[in-house]
């Protein structure tokens, strides 16, 4: 009964207004009030502040500064094997596995299509048809910077407007096409293992989504699809990111979806639904192509 009420509220609450209000409040310098809110958040969600570069909550002038806190360098070692792709975020595995034609598994009884997820971008749809995917859910207590699974050259970015449903496991199990309905940023990379998409999905109370090359992408929320193209690795203006390097961040938490093309990326057999993830740990084994797009 309680779960039904929670799902009903997802449809009834003014999600966009709540998200804008939360984003506004999270950027305010509230002095003792900000420190109090952060302290309560740390206690309620059992956040491990000893992993942070600045463990003292008094050092954070705003809630957002706390929320995107950097970790100590040694807190997330990156698997150094060049054939290993690593987990992009702290959280849990929501789902992972093969893309069956153009269908991506969301939860029991629910799939969504590549066409819907990728906003009808035919070139991307063709790349990832019959590929593989991994979906990582970031809970409020988690570290909220997103990192690269492998070396990559950014070739395209799409901003897709949409809903702002919560993306927690309960909502994923009950709202059809959730990740294809929510606001999202789609980042397409060329890698040694073929094309890879890293998709940052918005949600209720996610005040903004940022990337390291473009800064804040949303807000503003203008209701139109936006597209940016980027040059190959050896051209002026190229965006080249290395494995384990930060590529984006959420203010507050949400979901990351990775899409891999073909059969060159073999997801780790040790992974399963609700597996606890940490940045830098093994996600998959990759079979490198002959010609590297990074050279």
Swiss-Prot record:
GO terms for cellular component: plasma membrane. This is Phosphatidylserine decarboxylase proenzyme. It is an enzyme of class 4 (lyase). HAMAP family: PS_decarb_PSD_B_type1. GO terms for molecular function: phosphatidylserine decarboxylase activity. Belongs to the phosphatidylserine decarboxylase family. PSD-B subfamily. Prokaryotic type I sub-subfamily. The gene is psd. Binds 1 pyruvoyl group covalently per subunit. Catalyzes the formation of phosphatidylethanolamine (PtdEtn) from phosphatidylserine (PtdSer). Keywords: Cell membrane, Decarboxylase, Lipid biosynthesis, Lipid metabolism, Lyase, Membrane, Phospholipid biosynthesis, Phospholipid metabolism, Pyruvate, Zymogen. Heterodimer of a large membrane-associated beta subunit and a small pyruvoyl-containing alpha subunit. Its EC number is 4.1.1.65. NCBIfam families: PS_decarb (TIGR00163). It holds the Pfam family PS_Dcarbxylase. The active site is at 90 (charge relay system), 147 (charge relay system), 254 (charge relay system), 254 (schiff-base intermediate with substrate). PANTHER family: PHOSPHATIDYLSERINE DECARBOXYLASE, PHOSPHATIDYLSERINE DECARBOXYLASE PROENZYME, MITOCHONDRIAL. Pathway: Phospholipid metabolism; phosphatidylethanolamine biosynthesis; phosphatidylethanolamine from CDP-diacylglycerol: step 2/2. Disulfide bonds: none annotated. The modification Pyruvic acid (Ser) is found at residue 254.
